[in-house]
Protein backbone atom coordinates (compact mmCIF):
# COMPACT_ATOMS: atom_id res chain seq x y z
CA UNK A 1 0.00 0.00 0.00
CA UNK A 2 1.18 3.51 -0.85
CA UNK A 3 0.03 6.00 1.74
CA UNK A 4 0.35 9.78 1.97
CA UNK A 5 -0.07 11.65 5.23
CA UNK A 6 -1.07 15.29 4.92
CA UNK A 7 0.08 17.39 7.85
CA UNK A 8 3.46 17.66 9.54
CA UNK A 9 2.23 18.19 13.10
CA UNK A 10 2.76 15.70 15.90
CA UNK A 11 -0.07 13.35 14.88
CA UNK A 12 0.55 13.43 11.14
CA UNK A 13 4.28 12.87 11.60
CA UNK A 14 3.61 10.01 14.02
CA UNK A 15 1.20 8.25 11.66
CA UNK A 16 3.56 8.65 8.71
CA UNK A 17 6.45 7.29 10.77
CA UNK A 18 4.32 4.34 11.90
CA UNK A 19 3.42 3.51 8.30
CA UNK A 20 7.04 3.73 7.16
CA UNK A 21 8.25 1.53 10.00
CA UNK A 22 5.55 -0.98 9.09
CA UNK A 23 7.17 -1.24 5.66
CA UNK A 24 4.62 0.74 3.67
CA UNK A 25 5.55 3.21 0.95
CA UNK A 26 4.86 6.24 3.17
CA UNK A 27 5.08 9.92 2.24
CA UNK A 28 4.55 12.93 4.49
CA UNK A 29 3.42 16.32 3.20
CA UNK A 30 4.50 19.29 5.32
CA UNK A 31 3.75 22.97 4.77
CA UNK A 32 7.04 24.45 5.95
CA UNK A 33 10.26 24.09 3.97
CA UNK A 34 12.26 24.17 7.22
CA UNK A 35 10.40 21.14 8.60
CA UNK A 36 11.02 19.22 5.38
CA UNK A 37 14.71 20.08 5.42
CA UNK A 38 15.10 19.05 9.05
CA UNK A 39 13.38 15.69 8.58
CA UNK A 40 15.43 14.98 5.47
CA UNK A 41 18.74 15.89 7.10
CA UNK A 42 18.36 14.70 10.69
CA UNK A 43 15.22 12.47 10.61
CA UNK A 44 13.62 14.60 13.30
CA UNK A 45 10.64 16.96 13.59
CA UNK A 46 11.99 18.92 16.53
CA UNK A 47 9.13 21.41 16.77
CA UNK A 48 6.47 18.76 17.43
CA UNK A 49 8.37 15.57 18.34
CA UNK A 50 11.74 16.62 19.75
CA UNK A 51 14.26 13.86 20.27
CA UNK A 52 12.38 11.21 18.27
CA UNK A 53 14.21 9.70 15.30
CA UNK A 54 11.92 9.09 12.33
CA UNK A 55 12.16 6.18 9.93
CA UNK A 56 14.85 6.47 7.27
CA UNK A 57 12.26 5.13 4.81
CA UNK A 58 9.82 8.01 5.31
CA UNK A 59 9.73 10.39 2.36
CA UNK A 60 8.84 14.02 3.07
CA UNK A 61 7.99 16.89 0.75
CA UNK A 62 6.22 20.23 0.50
CA UNK A 63 5.07 19.34 -3.03
CA UNK A 64 1.52 17.89 -3.14
CA UNK A 65 2.11 16.30 -6.56
CA UNK A 66 5.22 14.46 -5.40
CA UNK A 67 3.55 13.21 -2.24
CA UNK A 68 0.38 12.04 -4.02
CA UNK A 69 1.98 10.32 -7.03
CA UNK A 70 0.72 6.75 -7.31
CA UNK A 71 -0.96 6.88 -3.89
CA UNK A 72 -4.36 5.29 -3.20
CA UNK A 73 -4.72 6.02 0.54
CA UNK A 74 -4.51 9.52 2.02
CA UNK A 75 -4.46 10.41 5.71
CA UNK A 76 -5.41 14.02 6.49
CA UNK A 77 -4.04 15.10 9.87
CA UNK A 78 -4.40 18.87 9.98
CA UNK A 79 -6.45 20.96 12.47
CA UNK A 80 -10.13 20.42 11.69
CA UNK A 81 -10.84 24.07 10.83
CA UNK A 82 -8.26 23.75 8.01
CA UNK A 83 -9.32 20.33 6.73
CA UNK A 84 -11.40 21.75 3.87
CA UNK A 85 -8.45 23.82 2.65
CA UNK A 86 -6.26 20.70 2.75
CA UNK A 87 -8.80 18.76 0.67
CA UNK A 88 -8.96 21.61 -1.84
CA UNK A 89 -5.18 21.73 -2.07
CA UNK A 90 -4.97 18.01 -2.89
CA UNK A 91 -8.15 17.36 -4.88
CA UNK A 92 -6.46 17.50 -8.28
CA UNK A 93 -3.92 14.90 -7.17
CA UNK A 94 -6.38 12.39 -5.67
CA UNK A 95 -7.52 9.47 -7.85
CA UNK A 96 -11.19 8.64 -8.25
CA UNK A 97 -12.54 6.57 -5.35
CA UNK A 98 -9.44 7.22 -3.23
CA UNK A 99 -9.52 6.14 0.39
CA UNK A 100 -9.46 9.34 2.46
CA UNK A 101 -8.72 8.80 6.14
CA UNK A 102 -9.44 11.75 8.42
CA UNK A 103 -7.37 11.91 11.61
CA UNK A 104 -8.71 15.35 12.62
CA UNK A 105 -11.32 15.70 15.35
CA UNK A 106 -13.91 18.46 15.40
CA UNK A 107 -16.80 20.22 13.67
CA UNK A 108 -16.28 22.79 10.91
CA UNK A 109 -17.37 26.06 12.49
CA UNK A 110 -18.53 27.92 9.37
CA UNK A 111 -20.84 25.13 8.17
CA UNK A 112 -21.45 22.99 11.30
CA UNK A 113 -20.43 19.99 9.17
CA UNK A 114 -18.80 16.89 10.60
CA UNK A 115 -15.48 15.75 9.14
CA UNK A 116 -17.14 13.20 6.84
CA UNK A 117 -19.60 15.82 5.57
CA UNK A 118 -16.75 18.23 4.83
CA UNK A 119 -14.92 15.50 2.92
CA UNK A 120 -17.93 14.50 0.84
CA UNK A 121 -18.64 18.16 0.10
CA UNK A 122 -15.10 19.24 -0.75
CA UNK A 123 -14.15 16.08 -2.67
CA UNK A 124 -17.51 15.31 -4.30
CA UNK A 125 -15.99 15.07 -7.77
CA UNK A 126 -13.76 12.11 -6.89
CA UNK A 127 -16.30 10.19 -4.76
CA UNK A 128 -13.85 9.27 -2.00
CA UNK A 129 -14.21 6.32 0.32
CA UNK A 130 -14.11 8.15 3.64
CA UNK A 131 -12.73 6.71 6.87
CA UNK A 132 -12.46 8.32 10.30
CA UNK A 133 -9.55 7.42 12.58
CA UNK A 134 -10.22 8.27 16.20
CA UNK A 135 -9.75 7.05 19.74
CA UNK A 136 -7.55 7.57 22.82
CA UNK A 137 -4.16 8.31 21.29
CA UNK A 138 -1.49 10.82 22.21
CA UNK A 139 1.17 11.20 19.52
CA UNK A 140 3.76 11.39 22.31
CA UNK A 141 2.89 7.82 23.33
CA UNK A 142 2.39 6.30 19.89
CA UNK A 143 5.74 7.60 18.58
CA UNK A 144 7.32 5.86 21.61
CA UNK A 145 5.56 2.62 20.67
CA UNK A 146 3.44 2.52 23.82
CA UNK A 147 0.33 0.28 23.49
CA UNK A 148 -2.55 2.21 21.92
CA UNK A 149 -5.95 1.12 20.56
CA UNK A 150 -8.09 3.21 18.20
CA UNK A 151 -11.15 2.93 15.98
CA UNK A 152 -11.39 3.24 12.20
CA UNK A 153 -14.90 3.97 10.92
CA UNK A 154 -15.73 3.40 7.26
CA UNK A 155 -18.88 2.43 5.35
CA UNK A 156 -16.73 0.38 2.96
CA UNK A 157 -15.85 -2.71 5.00
CA UNK A 158 -13.14 -3.88 2.62
CA UNK A 159 -11.42 -0.50 2.66
CA UNK A 160 -11.58 -0.51 6.46
CA UNK A 161 -10.10 -4.01 6.63
CA UNK A 162 -7.27 -3.07 4.27
CA UNK A 163 -6.31 -0.04 6.37
CA UNK A 164 -6.69 -1.97 9.60
CA UNK A 165 -4.27 -4.64 8.41
CA UNK A 166 -1.86 -2.14 6.87
CA UNK A 167 -1.48 0.14 9.89
CA UNK A 168 -1.96 -2.15 12.89
CA UNK A 169 1.22 -3.06 14.76
CA UNK A 170 2.05 -4.81 18.06
CA UNK A 171 1.72 -1.40 19.75
CA UNK A 172 -1.01 0.25 17.61
CA UNK A 173 -4.21 -1.79 17.42
CA UNK A 174 -7.05 -0.71 15.12
CA UNK A 175 -10.67 -1.79 15.53
CA UNK A 176 -13.21 -1.15 12.76
CA UNK A 177 -16.84 -0.06 12.61
CA UNK A 178 -19.24 1.27 10.00
CA UNK A 179 -20.60 4.00 12.33
CA UNK A 180 -18.76 6.98 10.88
CA UNK A 181 -21.10 9.54 12.43
CA UNK A 182 -20.76 8.14 15.93
CA UNK A 183 -16.97 7.94 15.77
CA UNK A 184 -16.49 11.45 14.40
CA UNK A 185 -18.85 13.02 16.94
CA UNK A 186 -17.20 11.23 19.85
CA UNK A 187 -13.83 12.57 18.80
CA UNK A 188 -15.20 16.10 18.53
CA UNK A 189 -17.32 16.40 21.66
CA UNK A 190 -14.83 14.82 24.07
CA UNK A 191 -12.58 17.86 23.62
CA UNK A 192 -15.30 20.15 24.99
CA UNK A 193 -15.78 17.95 28.04
CA UNK A 194 -12.01 17.91 28.54
CA UNK A 195 -12.00 21.71 28.81
CA UNK A 196 -14.69 21.39 31.49
CA UNK A 197 -12.64 18.74 33.30
CA UNK A 198 -9.62 21.02 33.20
CA UNK A 199 -11.68 23.84 34.69
CA UNK A 200 -12.80 21.56 37.53
CA UNK A 201 -9.23 20.46 38.19
CA UNK A 202 -7.99 24.04 38.04
CA UNK A 203 -10.56 25.11 40.61
CA UNK A 204 -9.21 22.45 42.96
CA UNK A 205 -12.14 20.03 42.80
CA UNK A 206 -11.47 16.34 43.24
CA UNK A 207 -12.09 13.03 41.55
CA UNK A 208 -15.82 13.20 42.27
CA UNK A 209 -16.26 16.24 40.04
CA UNK A 210 -14.09 14.78 37.28
CA UNK A 211 -16.02 11.50 37.31
CA UNK A 212 -19.33 13.37 37.16
CA UNK A 213 -18.18 15.46 34.20
CA UNK A 214 -16.92 12.44 32.29
CA UNK A 215 -20.13 10.48 32.88
CA UNK A 216 -22.52 13.32 32.15
CA UNK A 217 -20.33 14.37 29.24
CA UNK A 218 -20.81 10.90 27.80
CA UNK A 219 -24.58 11.34 28.10
CA UNK A 220 -24.31 14.68 26.30
CA UNK A 221 -22.20 13.12 23.55
CA UNK A 222 -24.71 10.29 23.14
CA UNK A 223 -27.71 12.63 22.95
CA UNK A 224 -26.26 14.71 20.14
CA UNK A 225 -24.90 11.60 18.46
CA UNK A 226 -28.30 9.94 18.39
CA UNK A 227 -29.92 13.12 17.04
CA UNK A 228 -27.38 13.15 14.20
CA UNK A 229 -27.69 9.48 13.30
CA UNK A 230 -24.92 7.90 15.34
CA UNK A 231 -25.21 4.58 17.18
CA UNK A 232 -25.31 5.09 20.96
CA UNK A 233 -23.26 1.92 21.44
CA UNK A 234 -20.36 3.56 19.60
CA UNK A 235 -20.00 6.11 22.39
CA UNK A 236 -19.29 3.28 24.84
CA UNK A 237 -16.20 2.32 22.83
CA UNK A 238 -12.71 3.63 22.18
CA UNK A 239 -13.78 6.65 20.13
CA UNK A 240 -16.31 7.69 22.77
CA UNK A 241 -15.67 6.73 26.37
CA UNK A 242 -12.05 5.76 25.71
CA UNK A 243 -11.06 9.07 24.17
CA UNK A 244 -13.18 10.98 26.68
CA UNK A 245 -11.42 9.43 29.69
CA UNK A 246 -7.95 10.02 28.24
CA UNK A 247 -8.59 13.61 27.22
CA UNK A 248 -10.23 14.51 30.54
CA UNK A 249 -7.47 13.02 32.69
CA UNK A 250 -4.22 13.03 30.71
CA UNK A 251 -1.58 15.66 31.37
CA UNK A 252 -0.79 15.69 27.63
CA UNK A 253 -4.35 16.82 26.80
CA UNK A 254 -4.21 20.30 25.26
CA UNK A 255 -7.93 20.85 25.84
CA UNK A 256 -7.67 19.95 29.51
CA UNK A 257 -4.74 22.37 29.79
CA UNK A 258 -6.93 25.14 28.35
CA UNK A 259 -9.50 24.49 31.08
CA UNK A 260 -6.86 24.39 33.81
CA UNK A 261 -5.46 27.75 32.76
CA UNK A 262 -8.88 29.37 32.37
CA UNK A 263 -9.70 28.32 35.93
CA UNK A 264 -6.51 30.05 37.08
CA UNK A 265 -7.76 33.32 35.59
CA UNK A 266 -5.74 33.37 32.37
CA UNK A 267 -7.31 34.86 29.24
CA UNK A 268 -8.19 32.56 26.35
CA UNK A 269 -6.24 34.53 23.74
CA UNK A 270 -3.12 34.43 25.92
CA UNK A 271 -3.49 30.68 26.44
CA UNK A 272 -3.88 29.96 22.73
CA UNK A 273 -0.97 32.23 21.79
CA UNK A 274 1.24 30.30 24.18
CA UNK A 275 0.40 26.83 22.79
CA UNK A 276 2.49 25.12 20.13
CA UNK A 277 -0.42 23.00 18.92
CA UNK A 278 -4.15 23.51 18.41
CA UNK A 279 -6.69 22.81 21.16
CA UNK A 280 -9.55 21.66 18.92
CA UNK A 281 -12.16 21.94 21.66
CA UNK A 282 -12.09 25.74 21.64
CA UNK A 283 -13.62 26.12 18.16
CA UNK A 284 -15.57 22.87 18.50
CA UNK A 285 -17.37 24.22 21.58
CA UNK A 286 -18.74 27.08 19.49
CA UNK A 287 -19.79 24.73 16.69
CA UNK A 288 -21.39 22.10 18.95
CA UNK A 289 -23.18 24.79 20.95
CA UNK A 290 -24.75 25.97 17.69
CA UNK A 291 -25.56 22.40 16.63
CA UNK A 292 -27.28 21.66 19.94
CA UNK A 293 -29.45 24.75 19.58
CA UNK A 294 -30.23 23.97 15.95
CA UNK A 295 -31.28 20.38 16.73
CA UNK A 296 -32.95 21.11 20.06
CA UNK A 297 -30.57 18.86 22.00
CA UNK A 298 -29.86 19.67 25.63
CA UNK A 299 -26.09 20.25 26.04
CA UNK A 300 -25.53 21.75 29.52
CA UNK A 301 -21.77 21.10 29.76
CA UNK A 302 -21.19 22.44 26.26
CA UNK A 303 -23.29 25.52 27.06
CA UNK A 304 -21.21 26.35 30.13
CA UNK A 305 -17.89 25.73 28.35
CA UNK A 306 -19.08 27.96 25.50
CA UNK A 307 -19.99 30.69 28.01
CA UNK A 308 -16.57 30.49 29.70
CA UNK A 309 -14.75 30.63 26.36
CA UNK A 310 -16.80 33.22 24.52
CA UNK A 311 -18.88 35.12 27.09
CA UNK A 312 -16.16 35.59 29.71
CA UNK A 313 -18.22 33.69 32.26
CA UNK A 314 -16.60 33.03 35.61
CA UNK A 315 -15.66 29.31 35.76
CA UNK A 316 -16.87 28.98 39.37
CA UNK A 317 -20.28 30.35 38.40
CA UNK A 318 -20.46 27.93 35.46
CA UNK A 319 -19.84 24.97 37.78
CA UNK A 320 -22.41 26.27 40.26
CA UNK A 321 -25.04 26.55 37.52
CA UNK A 322 -24.32 23.01 36.34
CA UNK A 323 -24.77 21.69 39.87
CA UNK A 324 -27.99 23.64 40.57
CA UNK A 325 -29.92 22.79 37.41
CA UNK A 326 -33.39 21.28 37.84
CA UNK A 327 -33.14 17.86 39.47
CA UNK A 328 -34.09 14.90 37.29
CA UNK A 329 -33.81 11.15 36.77
CA UNK A 330 -30.49 9.89 35.39
Swiss-Prot record:
Gene3D superfamilies: N-(1-d-carboxylethyl)-l-norvaline Dehydrogenase, domain 2, NAD(P)-binding Rossmann-like Domain. InterPro entries: 6-PGluconate_DH-like_C_sf (IPR008927), 6PGD_dom2 (IPR013328), G3P_DH_NAD-dep (IPR006168), G3P_DH_NAD-dep_C (IPR006109), G3P_DH_NAD-dep_N (IPR011128), NAD(P)-bd_dom_sf (IPR036291). It is an enzyme of class 1 (oxidoreductase). It holds the Pfam family NAD_Gly3P_dh_N. Disulfide bonds: none annotated. Signal peptide: none annotated. NADPH binds at residues 10-11, 31, 105, 139, 254, 278, 280. Keywords: Cytoplasm, Lipid biosynthesis, Lipid metabolism, NAD, NADP, Nucleotide-binding, Oxidoreductase, Phospholipid biosynthesis, Phospholipid metabolism. GO terms for molecular function: glycerol-3-phosphate dehydrogenase [NAD(P)+] activity; NAD binding. The keyword Lipid metabolism applies. HAMAP family: NAD_Glyc3P_dehydrog. This is Glycerol-3-phosphate dehydrogenase [NAD(P)+]. It comes from Solidesulfovibrio magneticus (strain ATCC 700980 / DSM 13731 / RS-1). The lineage of its organism: Bacteria, Pseudomonadati, Thermodesulfobacteriota, Desulfovibrionia, Desulfovibrionales.
